[in-house]
Amino acid sequence: MNFRALLVTFCGLMSSICAQALMSTSTLPEGINSPSFRFGIIDGIGQKYTESGSLMNLGDYKSVVFDAKNLAKFNSDAKRLIDALNRFGGHALGDSFNLGVLRVDTMPRVQYSAPVFARGITNRWTVGVGVPIISYTNKISLSQEFSNIEYYRQQFSGLNPELDDALNTDLSKATNETLTGKGYKALNNRDETFVGDIQVVSMYKLYEKNEKVLTYQAQVNLPTGPKFDPDDLASLNVFGRTNITNSLAYSQYLIGRLSMVPYVSYLINIPDTVTARVPLNEDDTLPDANTKEDVTRTLGNIATVGGNLFYEITDSWMVGGGYDYSTKDADRYTGERGTRYDLLATNSASTAHRVKAEITYSSVKSYFKKTAVIPLMVSFQVSDTFSGVNIERQTAQEMNLMLFF
């Protein structure tokens, strides 16, 4: 029963948390401080682009059909029931037994808020640090559909108490009982808030001449968020990671107030050690607790190429739009027991196409003209992952307020 693939499918979701804004080449003047506050919402992660690139609801993509074959693998009592039914007459009644389809529907939603502080070390070099506060909610429901259980109840109810119990199986209840028996946490709704991975950013202007700017940005993700939990199928499990993102961005004006910013970036994940349940084989979708071991995890690196366009409507208002394409390498796991570590990285390579839009209000120029009280910037961004492979459909919205002093 592939609940892990269904519920823990948010890999990469938070890798760019608090980084929904369009890439630019702006740095702070020397000695200028800029506290800011970001608030964002990420929706759409209840859908996923599959290995074929098709967009599917996770409830449809990972529904489990409980026919006789799957029941026998799932529960030893069910196998005995099937064998017993096969002995009634000559019609293979047990092999035709079907408890229907178990749907695990999820409604995950992530909100984040992040105080960020940046300072201009020189006119070319700016550093900053951000602390994301994550709010994660997920409404989880299990439902049973398309069962032929009523026919079997009519035919065989009352013959045997144990048979009656089997015929009255509640898949939702049985699922959580099975998970608990294997040491997993029950599938319940989630509503939790925690500190995510702290990010430290450095941006340096490598070149600046005639309104043409080339910048290098390094972003370090520190593993301050929750650690990987092998017993929680509904956990995000995308925090507690160390990685470094290196980016190059170039900007220049095209015509009048229209400018462009092409960029490339490469995220390097640092290997770490986590405790994981290692499947015994391809059919072992719910590994037992005794399969847990400390493994070395090397998450796939991510390469991104993209471009943005900005148009300055007035000295105070600007709009922008952009597109980027990213590709992630497959993950890799190693350990000392020599088991099927490759199964931990199944379908972990991914690609994504994303579009963004942004509108910004700035009072900075008005402040220097003595027509604004304080220098600030307020921006609103939206982004959408409109195509991909092995990645969640992510629709993000972010509001950003920046002050300067």
Spans of features found by a protein language model:
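Outer membrane beta-barrel transmembrane domains
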Residues: 52-71, 151-160, 164-176, 273-405
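Transmembrane beta-strands of outer-membrane beta-barrel pores
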Residues: 39-45, 131-137, 197, 206, ...
